Amino acid sequence: MPSPPPTPETATASDRTATPAPGMPILAVDAMGGDSAPGMVIAGLDIAAERHPNARFEVFGDAVQIDELVRLSKRLRNRVSIRPTTEIIPNELKPTAALRLRDASLRRAIDAVANGEAAGVISAGNTGAMLALAKIVLKTMSGIDRPAMAAIGPSARGDVVMLDLGANVVCDARNLVEFAVMGELFARTVLGLPHPTIGLLNVGSEEMKGDETLRRAAEALRESPIGPQFRGFIEGHDIAGGTVDVVVTDGFTGNVALKTGEGALRLVGDLLRRVFSANIASRLAYLLARPGLTRLREWLDPRRYNGAVLLGLNGVVVKSHGGADAEGFAHAVDVAMDMIVNRFNDRIRDDLGRHADRERLASDAFRATPPASATSVTTG
């Protein structure tokens, strides 16, 4: 007598691989990346599943652990396909070594995007390995020289998009213009801004400031279709000040600015805790200020801004912070789903077509220039 078909309660990892309905957005998930994986990852998917009822998840990693966790979630039972893998990429592993781990959960998740099994991939694992694997496996989109890492952060005027954050240490003018095009669309797609403003990060706001690369990029942006949205050069304090919606820079400068901002936020938090716990009077003051401080903490909550995106590849690639909790990971899933549902990559191709043909992108305004250390730089 044949055994009855498995129910959601009795299904094993290999059973839960139903084909999704047409039009369902599918996200490939590296379940083994992150400080608290796979528990944090599955808990984050559980939160995200409620916000994205049509989404499905291809989850890669230790099938036994993942299956036990998925069984605990009614929302995930029929929306997760578990893909067993035998290898994990540790955080300390160099990208060159990670490339050799063909059955690693991160590699298999990226492969799923390349094979058309998923529209995007998310991981909280090794950043360097994810960058290297995504570039090699997915490759850059036609019309894009280099991908860029973008993220959202707080500013005095709301949220701000910043790129590149470390994918490209040295950039030429053409790269910066491409970053601006991608960042502008990212702000429209994820932040919902109809006409986001753009600024080039520099050592001063005057037109003669900076090196030749920045000046050429600024000239090209002024003449581009997004020229009316380009506000010229901005300085470091303009990032938090909200002078523009999209901050464009090279990966070295962007990464330093990002880490500096994160450190400044931690310092503010530490100082507030010290001030309001110093004595009885300060504790009473805290009680009076508590509603406002609660709103401030919510506004600056790093979980709201979790989810850096590698733009310019043939597929959506989202990197969650390795130390994120379930809510933070769910926010990173939100970013990925926004990009998938809004057909971000298709729109990038359309925008690049509007900007210039390949001959213009190869013109003098976009040609590579030496790094700032080898050229004349005017500072403030």
Swiss-Prot record:
<keyword id="KW-0594">Phospholipid biosynthesis</keyword>
<dbReference type="GO" id="GO:0005737">
    <property type="term" value="C:cytoplasm"/>
</dbReference>
<comment type="function">
    <text>Catalyzes the reversible formation of acyl-phosphate (acyl-PO(4)) from acyl-[acyl-carrier-protein] (acyl-ACP). This enzyme utilizes acyl-ACP as fatty acyl donor, but not acyl-CoA.</text>
</comment>
<dbReference type="InterPro" id="IPR012281">
    <property type="entry name" value="Phospholipid_synth_PlsX-like"/>
</dbReference>
<comment type="similarity">
    <text>Belongs to the PlsX family.</text>
</comment>
<protein>
    <recommendedName>
        <fullName>Phosphate acyltransferase</fullName>
        <ecNumber>2.3.1.274</ecNumber>
    </recommendedName>
</protein>
<keyword id="KW-0808">Transferase</keyword>
<dbReference type="InterPro" id="IPR003664">
    <property type="entry name" value="FA_synthesis"/>
</dbReference>
<comment type="subunit">
    <text>Homodimer. Probably interacts with PlsY.</text>
</comment>
<dbReference type="GO" id="GO:0006633">
    <property type="term" value="P:fatty acid biosynthetic process"/>
</dbReference>
<keyword id="KW-0963">Cytoplasm</keyword>
<dbReference type="GO" id="GO:0043811">
    <property type="term" value="F:phosphate:acyl-[acyl carrier protein] acyltransferase activity"/>
</dbReference>
<keyword id="KW-1208">Phospholipid metabolism</keyword>
<dbReference type="Pfam" id="PF02504">
    <property type="entry name" value="FA_synthesis"/>
</dbReference>
<feature type="region of interest" description="Disordered">
    <location>
        <begin position="1"/>
        <end position="23"/>
    </location>
</feature>
<dbReference type="GO" id="GO:0008654">
    <property type="term" value="P:phospholipid biosynthetic process"/>
</dbReference>
<keyword id="KW-0443">Lipid metabolism</keyword>
<comment type="pathway">
    <text>Lipid metabolism; phospholipid metabolism.</text>
</comment>
<keyword id="KW-0444">Lipid biosynthesis</keyword>
